[in-house]
């Protein structure tokens, strides 16, 4: 609730106006039955036409208040709910960008999607329905009973008893429903995770002929959700039937007691209809409020899940230092852009170091390559440079400053990164290239495409405006890699990181691309993480990793003579035709 108040605080004025409009709506609604009873009892019974016309005008005004207030109140409530939900969603998204990789893994991709979309939609609907259907209940109940009491005290007491019984039933139902709704939300999380895995991995599932197995897995998850949803529906059905039953009982009781009161000349016959309208109005709103309140535990769970994201303290905190612009502008070929100084790293849940005592430098104007077997920690080096994780021991320095003393934004502003899995965003080729430089001209983009050997784009009828599907699935693996490289080249960076970014290229394209990169990145440091020895033959220095440790450092020629691990990798690839 504290989180909700925080996000509603900027809309205090809108909240006040919305409540005022709803109050006008409710007052108008409550006045009409009494006015109608007075018109019948006084005007029609006595034949007083002036009274009828005057009271009819008042009824018209009250009806206008109720109708206008209902329409305007609905609009204002919807606007308030949408604004608050939008702010919460933006806050959750912004917070997710601050989380480190290990922080993000605590929630999981499927859960974060659910929290950002489904959960906040539930919160939005809860805010809207609470304003429209729950908040008016106390006022309508008290005012309705008072109006009925003014008509006839006995009828007012009867109405008070009926409302109390319905409210007790509602509280009992809601108390039993809360745990079920909490479980329902966890089942939605599970469904999202399993569905996402099946959609993303559909080709693997088909390749291994595991459709039946995944169908069973999905069926289990769906069955669990369905069983819980059926329990919820049983509650709603029971609530519906019991509420309608009580409404009918209340109607019979009002007519029976009212008939006796009329027979005893204690009240007039038209007053029965007014009391009956108050009873039905109050019970209707109580019934609707019950429906809404039943969903509030789920909304509270969703709000709590959003709060979990917003209140998590990121394990990686921005430092306060800034890089020296003069140092970063230096073009000295010996200038070390990034330095690993006896750096070791261990994942939070690991028993041993993933990387151990790494010491080497990436220098401006030089190419540093990292090679090693699968699982040796090559890609982790790139993630550490981007500060997706922090070093456990030792230090990594960028232009002489420890990464932990810098902001993540400043670090990543100096680095251009091509990930191991080339990912393109839905849109066009041009919109993807502008991820690297929003102000890029067409000439800049064409130059980057040429360097990245991506001129195939120009052969397309739409050129730079060629559509790109989500993930770039309308391009081949090699084309995606080259477009990702072109996107990185759009960014004039101090350090370019290519994480196995040439693996899908044929040898001719690989060689042409690396040759073009030499001129394009001559004023920057280049770090290439590769599996193929042919990709890094001409690197200025090659770092050989085995089980997270540096077992070789030098040029290709030096390592062939001094490093057994490197020589074994090179010879195995040569025998394999590489």
In which residue ranges do the predicted regions lie?
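Loop segments that connect adjacent transmembrane helices in multi-pass transporters
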Residues: 110, 183-231
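Cytosolic ends of transmembrane helices, especially the final helix of ABC transmembrane type-1 domains
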Residues: 187, 191, 200, 206, ...
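ABC-type nucleotide-binding domain
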Residues: 326-578
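Juxtamembrane loop-to-helix connectors within ABC transporter transmembrane domains
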Residues: 97-141
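Membrane-integrated ABC transporters
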Residues: 1-32, 36, 44-59, 73-77, ...
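Hydrophobic alpha-helical segments in the permease module
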Residues: 59-70, 163-167, 236-252, 256-257, ...
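Transmembrane helices of ABC transporter permease
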Residues: 10, 14-25, 129-184, 256-267
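Helix-loop junctions and hydrophobic alpha-helical segments within the transmembrane domains
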Residues: 92, 96, 205, 306, ...
């Amino acid at each position: 609730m504290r989180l909700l108040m925080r996000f509603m605080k900027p809309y205090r004025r809108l909240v006040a106006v919305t409540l005022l409009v709803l109050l006008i709506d409710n007052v108008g609604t409550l006045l009409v039955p009494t006015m109608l009873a007075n018109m019948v009892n006084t005007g029609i019974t006595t034949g007083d036409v002036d009274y009828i016309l005057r009271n009819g005008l008042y009824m018209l005004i009250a009806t206008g208040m109720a109708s206008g207030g209902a329409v305007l109140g609905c609009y204002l409530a919807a606007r308030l709910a949408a604004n608050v939900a939008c702010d919460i969603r933006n806050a959750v998204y912004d917070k997710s960008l601050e989380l480190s990789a290990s922080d993000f893994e605590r929630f999981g991709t499927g859960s974060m999607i659910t929290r950002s979309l489904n959960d906040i939609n539930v919160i939005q609907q809860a805010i809207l329905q609470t304003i429209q259907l729950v908040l008016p209940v106390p006022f309508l109940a008290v005012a309705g009973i008072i109006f009925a009491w003014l008509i006839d005290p006995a009828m007012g007491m009867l109405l008070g008893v009926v409302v109390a019984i319905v409210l007790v039933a509602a509280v009992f139902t809601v108390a039993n429903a809360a745990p079920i709704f909490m479980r329902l939300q966890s089942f939605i999380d599970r469904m999202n995770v399993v569905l996402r895995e099946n959609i993303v991995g559909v080709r693997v599932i088909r390749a291994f002929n595991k459709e039946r197995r995944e169908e069973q897995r999905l069926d289990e998850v769906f069955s669990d959700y369905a069983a819980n949803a059926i329990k919820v529906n049983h509650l709603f059905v029971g609530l519906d039937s019991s509420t309608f039953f009580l409404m009918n009982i209340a109607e019979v009781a009002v007519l029976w007691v009212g008939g006796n009161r009329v027979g005893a000349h204690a009240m007039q016959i038209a007053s029965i209809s007014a009391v009956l309208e108050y009873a039905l109005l109050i019970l209707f709103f109580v019934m609707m409020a019950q429906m809404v309140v039943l969903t509030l535990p789920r909304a509270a769970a969703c709000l709590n899940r959003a709060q979990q994201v917003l209140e998590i303290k990121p394990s990686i905190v921005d430092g306060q230092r800034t890089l020296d612009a003069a140092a970063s502008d230096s073009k000295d070929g010996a200038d070390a852009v990034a330095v690993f100084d006896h750096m070791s790293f261990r994942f939070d849940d690991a028993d041993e170091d993933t990387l151990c005592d790494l010491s080497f430098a990436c220098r401006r104007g030089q190419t540093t390559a990292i090679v090693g077997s699968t699982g040796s920690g090559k890609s982790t080096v790139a993630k550490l440079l981007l500060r997706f994780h922090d070093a456990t021991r030792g230090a990594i320095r960028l232009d002489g400053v420890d990464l932990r003393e810098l902001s993540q934004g400043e670090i990543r502003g100096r680095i251009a990164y091509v990930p191991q899995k080339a990912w393109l965003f839905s849109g066009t080729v041009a919109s993807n290239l502008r991820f690297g430089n929003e102000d890029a001209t067409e000439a800049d983009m064409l130059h980057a495409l040429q360097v990245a050997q991506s001129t195939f784009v120009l052969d397309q009828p739409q050129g730079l405006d060629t559509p790109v599907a989500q993930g770039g699935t309308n391009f081949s693996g090699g084309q995606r890699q080259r477009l990702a490289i072109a996107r990185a080249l759009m960014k004039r960076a101090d350090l370019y990181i290519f994480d196995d970014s040439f693996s899908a290229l044929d040898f001719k394209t690989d060689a042409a691309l690396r040759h073009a990169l030499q001129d394009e990145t001559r004023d920057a440091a280049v770090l290439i993480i590769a599996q193929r020895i042919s990709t890094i033959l001409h690197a200025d220095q090659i770092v050989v990793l085995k089980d997270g440790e540096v077992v070789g450092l030098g040029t290709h020629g030096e390592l062939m003579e001094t490093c057994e691990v490197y020589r074994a990798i090179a010879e195995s690839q040569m025998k394999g035709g590489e």
